[in-house]
Amino acid sequence: VFSNLDQNNIEAKVIPDSKENNEEKNNPRYLFTDVDGLRVRYTDLGFGDSVVLLLHGFGGDLDNWFFNHDALAEKHRTLALDLPGHGQSGKTIHDPSLSGMATFVSNFLDVLAVPSVHVVGHSMGGAIAMQLLLECPETVKSLGLICSAGLGPEINSDYLRGFVEAKTSHELKQVVQQLFADESLATLQLIEDLLKYKLSEGVEAAL
């Protein structure tokens, strides 16, 4: 689910959102830029020299941080993005390695002219955050990990396989409930949103 990028060829621009639905187009929270040919959706809230970057997990998107955005933005500039292959970002992906994603995140920050960040990563996003720290230590001012991947050899392959292969809301719900101690939190709206993402063009191949 990651992109192989040339760090010497980065173009920054806001792309008109002509292909999104009306709700997306009219939502000022969402911005779009281009990182070496890949369309990226992101949010940029708050102000100041202290910048927080939020990295979501596998199968998620920047809206996983919806209830954190405004609270963090009260005291920090707060960035979140749809990682390659996720959300409304591009689905053409060439490098599925952690190193490839760390490079992508670094290039994304270069596009926004952000030299350093406090990184918070969840699940896969945590593993990417740690890789970013290893490869670009000058970029990471602090590291916050939430249920991070990469801290041990265990990988829940049944969950990953089930998420990728689920074709219906019923199948997907059985998988997503594994993420919650209280299974009732896997709401119908959550399942429908995830299924809509999974059925989007290019997602199956990206995952």
Annotate each language-model stretch with its function.
Residues V1-V52, A73-H76, V114-P115, L145, ...:
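Alpha/beta-hydrolase fold catalytic core
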Residues R29-L31, V35-T43, L79-M124:
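Active-site loop/oxyanion-hole signature of alpha/beta-hydrolase fold enzymes
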Residues L38-Q88:
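Conserved HGGG/HGGXW glycine-rich cap/lid loop of the alpha/beta-hydrolase fold
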Residues V40, E154, F163-L207:
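Conserved alpha/beta-hydrolase catalytic His-Asp/Glu region
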Residues N64-F66, S89-D95, E154-S157:
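Conserved catalytic-core motifs of eukaryotic protein kinase domains, centered on the activation segment
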Residues F66, S106, M130-L134:
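Short, hydrophobic alpha-helix immediately C-terminal to the catalytic nucleophile
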Residues R77, V111-E154:
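Conserved hydrolase catalytic core segment
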Residues G87-Q88, A149-N156, E183:
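A short beta-to-alpha transition loop/helix N-cap that caps and shapes the active-site region
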